[in-house]
UniProtKB/Swiss-Prot annotation:
Annotated stretches, region: RNA-binding: 129-198
Disrupted-gene phenotype: Females show no impaired oogenesis but display a defect in the formation of primordial follicles leading to infertility. Most embryos arrested at the 2-cell stage and fail to complete the second round of DNA replication due to an insufficient supply of histone H3 and H4. Accumulation of histone H2A and H2B is not affected.
UniProt similarity note: Belongs to the SLBP family.
A GO molecular function held by the record: histone pre-mRNA stem-loop binding
Taxonomic lineage from the root: Eukaryota, Metazoa, Chordata, Craniata, Vertebrata
Origin species: Mus musculus
Oligomeric form and interacting partners: Monomer. SLBP/pre-mRNA complex interacts with ZNF473. Interacts with the Importin alpha/Importin beta receptor, LSM1, MIF4GD, TNPO3 and UPF1. Interaction with LSM1 occurs when histone mRNA is being rapidly degraded during the S phase. Found in a ternary complex with ERI1 and the stem-loop structure of the 3' end of histone mRNA. Associates with polyribosomes. Identified in a histone pre-mRNA complex, at least composed of ERI1, LSM11, SLBP, SNRPB, SYNCRIP and YBX1. Binds in a cooperative manner with ERI1 to the mature 3'-end of histone mRNAs.
Function: RNA-binding protein involved in the histone pre-mRNA processing. Binds the stem-loop structure of replication-dependent histone pre-mRNAs and contributes to efficient 3'-end processing by stabilizing the complex between histone pre-mRNA and U7 small nuclear ribonucleoprotein (snRNP), via the histone downstream element (HDE). Plays an important role in targeting mature histone mRNA from the nucleus to the cytoplasm and to the translation machinery. Stabilizes mature histone mRNA and could be involved in cell-cycle regulation of histone gene expression.
Keyword Nucleus recorded: yes
Protein name: Histone RNA hairpin-binding protein
Keywords: Cytoplasm, Isopeptide bond, mRNA processing, Nucleus, Phosphoprotein, Ribonucleoprotein, RNA-binding, Ubl conjugation
Gene name linked to the record: Slbp
Cellular component per GO, a single term: histone pre-mRNA 3'end processing complex
Chain positions of motif Nuclear localization signal NLS1: 31-34
């Protein structure tokens, strides 16, 4: 009885067309035409290689922008904005709670048992700004005004319990509803009022101190040249307010003290004989 030779392992799987896809024939990589008869482009081979090599979706990597972005400034602004948003949300919640407490106290004082008084005082004021973007913009403007030397001097020289309305500047209430123009005007007036507490020049900069001038010596010189100053006062006015021809004419009159022609015509002295 004849025995059939054994086939090598894996032969049946290859014969049955196994799970692994067949690689393209070597001759197909260098051909100039595709299967449909059109010319083969170099992009076609690159796209095919990329598709077989990487099966990740297009959203796997973050697309880069057209221009380089500064990561440090974006990160700092993002952190600052997040901190300001958290602080503003806490402040608006505290402000609403304060309004409710004050309103509840007024309601208890004014209530005399009648339902009309309770209904009139139980409503919460509706003129409260709750827009987060508006509150953050207003907070930035307030921070710019408070981050000054004038504001530091103001809070040190005038404590809170000594401040009087209408005399001392008061920070605008960012939680009240105002129009954009009204709020900007309040911020502008508040910053202008804070300039009253600006430091003097000698404290803020290293300028030389101006020494007082002794006017006694100037009086004697003024009495001697009073006649000349009276005649030349009108000419000096023309120097600053006149035409260039007048300016040139006045300059010649002022410089009459030194006569160039007389100096040139004067005979030279023999300095060797004098020595």
């Amino acid at each position: 009885m004849a025995c059939r030779p054994r086939s090598p392992p894996g032969y049946g799987s290859r014969r049955d067309g196994g799970a692994s896809p067949r690689s393209p024939a070597r001759w197909s990589l260098g051909r100039k035409r595709r299967a449909d008869g059109r010319d083969r482009k170099p992009e076609d081979s690159e796209e095919g290689e990329l598709q077989t090599a990487d099966h990740r979706p297009e959203s796997f990597t973050t697309p880069e922008g057209h221009k380089p972005r500064s990561r440090c400034s974006d990160w700092a602004s993002a952190v600052e904005e997040d901190e300001m948003r958290t602080r503003v949300n806490k402040e608006i919640a505290r402000y609403k709670r304060k309004l409710l407490i004050n309103d509840f106290g007024r309601e208890r004082k004014s209530s005399s048992g009648s339902s009309d008084s309770k209904e009139s005082m139980s409503s919460v004021p509706a003129d409260v700004e709750t827009d987060e973007s508006v509150l953050m913009r207003r907070q930035k403007q307030i921070n710019y005004g408070k981050n000054t030397i004038a504001y530091d001097r103001y809070i040190k020289e005038v404590p809170r319990h000594l401040r009087q309305p209408g005399i001392h500047p008061r920070t605008p209430n960012k939680f009240k509803k105002y129009s954009r123009r009204s709020w900007d005007q309040q911020i502008k007036l508040w910053k202008v009022a804070l300039h009253f507490w600006d430091p003097p020049a000698e404290e803020g900069c290293d300028l030389q101190e101006i020494q007082p001038v002794d006017l006694g010596e100037m009086e004697t010189e003024f009495t001697e040249s009073s006649s000349e100053s009276q005649t030349s006062s009108q000419d000096n006015f023309d120097v600053y307010a006149g035409t260039p021809t007048k300016v040139r004419h006045v300059d010649c009159q002022v410089e009459d003290e030194f006569d160039l022609e007389a100096c040139l015509t004067e005979p030279l002295k023999d300095f060797s004989a004098m020595s």
